[in-house]
Amino acid sequence: MPRIIFPFESAHVHLAVEGSTGGTTLGLHMAADAIRDGGRVLWASPDMPDGVRFGQLFEHLSLADSSKFHAMNLVGNLSQAVDVLVETSTALPSVRLVVLDDWCAHSGRIPIDRINDMSKLASSLGDDISLLLISKAGINAGDSQSDLTVRGKEKMQQAGFQIWTLTRKQDGPKRTVTINDEIIECRIDDEGFVAR
């Protein structure tokens, strides 16, 4: 099955993920695509991606290409991390994607200062650099058709972010990626996200 190519070029994306369904994997999948297309990736998260999973998703890239993945530990003051990411995105040539994985708490409202930091980051990046924010979605306790809630959705949209979701309807490899209102049914495997 062919790997899915997600439309993230020059986009600012807030990806809300149902717990443990592959949000980091989706970010790595998109990172590998950005590198394959000649770009560099800046990755920031509290924990570095699993080395085995990284190897699987980057297996089709050369070792030289894999070195275009630049990771930093996202701990402490988010405003300072934003400044470092902006500075690095201009210092390194051909940065095409900046990813912040687990950039906010796993539950509750996303504080407005965090959203403001992400808005500042988005507006400070060059027009040819995409931004992907990965966070856990909330659980919907209301009458909505969806089981999850995109935390900070309205504020993120006001800041110019597209809203994507990643869900799993049942155990197993089948996943659903929703990009704005477009639904992509896919399967997760060693290579990343593939059509099903």
Say what each PLM segment does.
Residues 1-11, 194-196:
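A short, basic N-terminal segment
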Residues 2-5, 82-94:
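Conserved alpha-helical scaffold flanking the Walker A/P-loop in AAA+ ATPase domains
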Residues 8-84:
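Conserved P-loop
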Residues 32-36, 90, 123-126:
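Residue-level signal for alpha-helix termini/capping positions
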Residues 47-50, 75-78, 104-105, 137-141, ...:
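Conserved nucleotide-binding/hydrolysis micro-motifs of P-loop NTPases
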Residues 61-64, 90, 155-156:
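Structural motif
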Residues 93-159:
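P-loop NTPase motor core
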Residues 129-196:
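Phosphate-binding/switch region of NTP-binding enzymes
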